[in-house]
Structure formats: C-alpha cells, structure tokens
Amino acid sequence: MKPTVFIQANERQQLGAKISAHSYKRNSANPDAFDVRILHTRDFPRLMDPNQSVLRGGQVRQWDPDDLQSFTPLRFYPPQAMGFEGRAVVTDPDVFALGDIGELFARDLKGKAIWAVPRPGHNNRPDYIATSVMLLDCSKLRHWQFDDYLDGLFGHRFDYFDWIDLDREDPDTIGLLEPEWNDFDRLTPRTKLLHTTKRRTQPWKTGLPVDFTLQRSWPVNLLNRMLLRYLPHPDPNQEAFIYSLLAELVDSGEVTVDEVKREMAANHVRHDSLELIERYRGWDARMALAA
C-alpha cells in the first residue's frame, strides 16, 4: 500500500478538505508516490450519533456531530485503514501543503511510531504535542483499534483530552517534527504545511456565525453561536493562498461553481467566495512570500 495522507473532514469542513487534498498533490515533486484520502464523519455512524457524551477536561459533555471539529477522533483511524502497515500522515482539514509531503514520508523515523510538532504553552501545557498533523508508522500502532477507542471515549473510560493529546501513549515512541510541518497561522518561505488553526479567523469563514464549541457551558456556547462571527485572518497571504488553490480546483472541474454556491448557502464558506476565487486565481505563494 502506498504511503497515504489522511485528511479528516465533516460537512462543515468538506470543501476545506478538498482544497487540502489538492495542495498535497499539487506541491509534490512525485504526486503519484502517495495517495490522499479524505475521512468523512458521515462514513462513521458512531460519530454521527448525538445521543452520547464524552469526558472532556473532567466534565461530561454531550457529543455534537455538527460541531466544526467533530472529526478529531478520526486522527486515530489511519493505522487501521492501512492494515497496520506502512506510513501515513493524518491532518486536519484546515492544513494546506506549501512544501512536498514526500519529504515527510521519506524521513528516518528512528524507531518512533508517531512524529508530530511540539507546541509548548498551548492549553497551558509545556509539553503539548499537536496531533493535528502526525506522521505515523502504522506497524507500530496496532493498539490503535478504532472501535475500541470509540467504546472507551463514549463509555467515559478515558478523557477526550488525554486521548487527543497522546497522554495515553509511551512518550518514548513519539518523535518531534520541525515547526514548519505544522505552521500555526504562519506562512513563510520555510512553511511546509500551513495550519489555519485559530478557528475564529479561518480565511474561508470570514463574516459567518461561529459554528464551533468552546470549553464552556451549553447556554454560553449557544449564545456564542448566535452572536459571534468569524473574523478576517490577519495575514492576507493566507487568504490568497487558500483561494488560489480553490480557483485551481474550480478551473479543473474538481469543484464546481454550484458546489461552492451550496457551501456558501449552508454557511460553510464565506459568501464572497466566488469573488475571491476570481481575485486570487493564479496567485503564486512562493513569489509573494519571497517579495
């Protein structure tokens, strides 16, 4: 089986996932050497059931299949999908390749099962590891049995954060990637994978009502969803980069104008997306970043 990039997605992030998938192939010197696969929550019935709850930060919270980030359990599915063989990269749908993912697949894993970018200080943790991008040696992750994990998650046998933050893994099996392989809202000539991780400023969402859950009580979350709006991203180059990729997808027919219109009508992407496609068609990220 070829090395595979797995991109998590749900209804709210499916267009972002398509843009992400395009970026990996587009910016690789050898795009036929690996596969790209989108993992959509709708194909996993247990993730679509709202009548269940999880432990999250020590508190019981209702599971919301419609949340912006309901795909995150799928970070732990790729080894099983690969038959516990070979290498996989798993990413969130708001991660876009500027560099060549083949470089990541080709690196010496030094016996480690998991490689990811450290993010010291995030969530008040000096040892935080970002699982939004992971390079995996699937042969060393046979304990990642996805159905068993979902049993444990929805059965409150472990805390969501302990799982998603890799606290249940042996730290000796985790290697640390360079920051450019999960560049958090930073686009520079060194960036390999751009991650538009600040949900409030995702470039394709500007002006829309927020559709994600904060770590607060449900009345506060409901009020936030009613009142809060996505803000413009502070770096216009990131907006340009993402919409230039979407323009290529539209021009190739992989994404239709009608699909973009449906996503706009559903408030999954900003309502001026067609104008931005025209504005940024042909925009060259490397030239812009070198200027």
What are these regions (language model features)?
Residues 74-119, 126, 135-138:
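GT-A fold catalytic core of metal-dependent nucleotide-sugar glycosyltransferases
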Residues 1-3, 9-12, 18, 36-38, ...:
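A glycosyltransferase accessory/donor-loop signature
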Residues 32, 75, 91, 129-132, ...:
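Residues that flank catalytic or metal-binding motifs in active/ligand-binding sites
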Residues 33-81:
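Active-site-proximal specificity loops/subdomain of glycosyltransferases
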Residues 23-32:
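Short, acidic, metal-binding catalytic loop of nucleotide-sugar glycosyltransferases
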Residues 78, 114, 131-135, 174-176, ...:
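Conserved hydrophobic/aromatic beta-strand scaffold that supports enzyme active sites
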